[in-house]
Regions:
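Flavin-dependent oxidoreductase catalytic core characteristic
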Residues: 2-765
Length: 765
């Protein structure tokens, strides 16, 4: 019987982890003897203090400082360079109000985040930045130890909270996402997917697992994807055949291409939720979910008939244990079928509350909606972390200038601002969009399920596409130092990349949106309100066109009139839906006439529909993007309009304006070719965008950056402490010392550099 020799038990850490822990303790002791421990301890404490303050703004205390800060007198700038004169002092920046307004969680829910933060503060030996040079097995061990600590020792997560207070559960999970996406995914697999699927697809008989899920005695995994099938879940080949003589299901992998692939928690799981084709007698009832034991929960030995392998090194998320699984005629009790939407009785008869197989299939995959909603939040966090690092770097990094004068902070260069600031505005749009999805999910009802499905698919695809592109550009804006793993931008790029295909390939998800747009086309054109569209409602195209005055606006500032830009994007969406629907219909009619004799009658409808869809696929994707952009714009506009705090509203209004101008610019080709805007106005648009960017003062940008993320990303090129205090430093040397400190605190493979040899033995931070 195969056995995991290196699998850590719940009672003791692995040998490699013990060795690593010993090395860390030895290094800490040596650093203490040499006076270096003050650096690590102080930084670690400061980072966790910042994290605590950020994640719980309701209890945040105003920091007393002798520095001049944005929260007191505006940003202080004593730079004696060729940069513009220091800007006038600003009003008190509403950090607390803005942070609270950006949060989707209530004060009570934020306490769950605070609990996670405090737990991390209590264990700096586990939650530290010195893990980038660990071996892969050490990374897996460390990730598992971190999860065990948060779940078993600190009780930060439970199935009961997930079931009865889902918003509180997601609040706690969000704190983990800020620290490490792989730790977040591993914890989500145990609770959101393993326990969450039992809750959503199972019945009373499956609640017996919950206590052991909380204690991690039963680690779980979630197996849909196969080597040959990812997006096409209907096509998976793993079978679950009912055996009447033994009242069991036989789980079987019929071919190597049917092996389950990318299965998270594969190194530690005892149980696996296996999606397979349910076969009763000679009839295939489609994809259902089964609880399949894969390891002995006491010995951790792999069970007979189960084969588990390692998918090995990935592009990112290296500290997440993804594996592959095969099943050789493994028998499980009939009760292990998650039977909420379909069951096999003791008499061996299949029954389901759904008469429509497609509706049943959709219900079976309901947990994917939760995954897509979670990815929207995680993707937005990834953008926020990279923005904070890049903005902090840009204020401190100095390059070029007038002869015999100090060099300029790179934030003063137009190219830097015109790249970063529009992405900052986009972040706030995405933050509110993710929050909107959060509220839809935790308050979901059968009536809102369709809207939730469409928005989670569309937002996940759009946000991850845009954010991956933005993070790559932000890396470039940090120059060569941004390439260093010490600053974690490259790690963020690698970890975030999977979000574009994780929980649904983005191209496929956009087509999910397209299906609903076409299905609701008749309602839109007859002026009926459609539950798929959460916007303000729609009008007949002629009416919309008459309201768009893009060719007749007096000047570019009129572009920021909400009546104009809301109608502009509604019109664009209407036109695109009408165009693609008409083209799809015409192609379908042509195909029906052309192959009337060549294709059997019983196959003709499906074949023609498939081919017609493929011929308009690119246009369908463009239409889905138009829908998502319109929804995000509506959400951002409404959040700014409804903001109760005057100063916060003014700050967000400027971000909304920059987002609107960027969105119009992105779609300007469409507006020009469809006579919705004139070439002259497009030129004015570029100037207006530059004007809005120029109006954003340093103190305002630092104040906004303060709300992005806590000081937990461990990027030495960013002065997070300065951002938190609103201080523009005139001395960038701590940033460069930070690079050296981080390098020396990680494993040195060559050379003779030490804290002493480079003069850092007495540095104070």
């Amino acid at each position: 019987m195969p056995k995991d020799q290196d699998l850590p038990s719940d009672k003791s850490p692995t040998t490699s982890n013990l060795q690593r822990s010993s090395r860390i303790q030895k290094a800490l002791q040596e650093a203490s003897d040499q006076g270096k421990i003050k650096i690590e301890d102080k930084n670690g404490q400061r980072r966790m203090d910042m994290l605590r303050s950020h994640l719980n703004p309701d209890t945040q205390k105003q920091e007393k400082s002798s520095h001049v800060t944005t929260s007191e007198k505006g940003v202080k700038s004593s730079t004696k360079s060729s940069s513009p004169e220091p800007q006038k002092q600003q009003n008190v920046f509403p950090t607390d109000e803005l942070t609270a307004y950006l949060s989707p969680f209530s004060p009570k829910e934020n306490k769950a985040r605070e609990k996670v933060v405090q737990a991390m503060r209590d264990r700096p030996d586990l939650f530290h930045p010195y893990d980038i040079d660990l071996s892969r097995i050490e990374k897996l061990d460390l990730n598992y130890e971190r999860m065990k600590y948060l779940v078993k020792e600190k009780k930060c997560f439970s199935v009961d909270t997930l079931e009865h207070e889902p918003a509180t559960h997601f609040a706690a999970m969000s704190a983990v996402a800020y620290f490490d996406p792989a730790l977040s995914v591993k914890t989500m697999l145990q609770f959101n997917f393993w326990a969450g699927t039992l809750l959503s697809l199972g019945t009373q008989r499956h609640r017996k697992y919950f206590d052991k899920i909380d204690s991690l005695e039963l680690m779980g995994s979630y197996a849909i994807t196969e080597l040959a099938h990812g997006s096409n879940v209907r096509g998976i080949q793993t079978t679950a055949t009912y055996c009447a003589d033994s009242d069991t299901f036989e789980i079987h992998t019929p071919s190597r291409e049917a092996c389950k692939w990318w299965i998270g928690n594969s190194r530690h799981c005892h149980m696996c939720l296996v999606f397979a084709q349910l076969i009763v007698g000679k009839e295939n009832h489609g994809v259902h979910c089964f609880v399949v034991p894969v390891r002995d929960s006491t010995s951790n030995e792999i069970l007979p008939g189960v084969i588990i392998g390692d998918c090995t090194v990935k592009e990112g998320l290296d500290n997440l244990d993804n594996g592959f699984l095969l099943f050789n005629n493994v028998h499980i009790p009939r009760e292990n079928l998650l039977n909420k939407h379909g069951d096999v009785t003791e008499a061996g008869k299949y029954q389901s509350p759904y008469k429509n197989a497609s509706q049943r299939f959709g219900a079976m995959l309901s947990t994917l909606t939760m995954g897509r909603y979670s990815i929207c939040g995680s993707s937005t966090v990834s953008l926020a972390k990279t923005l904070a690092t890049t903005i902090g770097f840009s204020f401190e990094r100095r390059q070029f200038g007038i002869s015999n004068k100090p060099e300029n902070p790179v934030i003063n260069f137009q190219a830097q601002k015109h790249t970063i600031y529009p992405m900052l505005a986009e972040y706030f749009a995405f933050r509110f969009a993710s929050n909107h999805l959060h509220h839809l999910y935790v308050n979901r009802t059968p009536e809102t399920s369709q809207t939730l499905h469409v928005l989670s698919a569309g937002f996940k695809a759009y946000l991850t596409d845009r954010n991956q592109s933005s993070i790559l550009k932000l890396r470039e804006k940090c120059g060569g130092l941004g390439y260093s793993q010490l600053n974690r931008i490259g790690l963020t790029i690698a970890n975030h990349d999977i979000f574009k295909t994780f929980e649904g390939d983005n191209t496929v998800l956009f087509q999910e949106v397209s299906k609903y747009l076409l299905a609701n086309f008749k309602n839109i054109m007859s002026q009926k309100y459609s539950n798929v569209f959460s916007s303000v409602g729609y009008y007949v195209l002629d009416s919309l066109n008459s309201n768009v005055k893009g060719r007749h606006l007096r000047n570019a500032t009129d572009l920021l009139d909400s009546n104009f830009y809301l109608t502009l994007f509604e019109t664009k969406l209407e036109k695109q839906v009408q165009s693609v629907a008409t083209r799809f219909r015409d192609i379908l009619n042509e195909l029906q006439l052309s192959n009337k004799e060549s294709i059997p009658k019983d196959e003709r409808k499906e074949v023609n529909k498939f081919n017609a869809w493929n011929l308009v696929q690119t246009q369908l994707l463009e239409t889905s993007i138009a829908y998502v952009e319109n929804e995000i714009l509506q959400i951002f506009h409404n959040k700014v309009k409804d903001c109760p705090h005057k100063q916060t509203k003014q700050i967000l209004q400027k971000q909304l304006h920059l987002f609107v101008l960027g969105l119009i610019e992105k779609n300007s080709t469409y507006f020009l070719t469809h006579d919705l805007m004139s070439p002259k106005l497009v030129k004015q648009l570029v100037k207006e965008k530059a004007r809005v960017i120029s109006s954003m003062e340093d103190g305002e940008i630092l104040g906004l950056t303060k709300t992005l993320v806590p000081d937990v990303v461990y990027a030495p090129i960013c002065n997070y402490e300065g951002i938190m205090k609103g201080v523009v430093s005139t001395d960038p040397s701590p940033m460069y010392d930070g690079m050296l400190i981080q390098a020396l605190n990680n494993r040195q493979l060559f050379g003779n550099a030490t804290f002493e040899t480079i003069g850092l033995q007495n540095i104070k931070q």
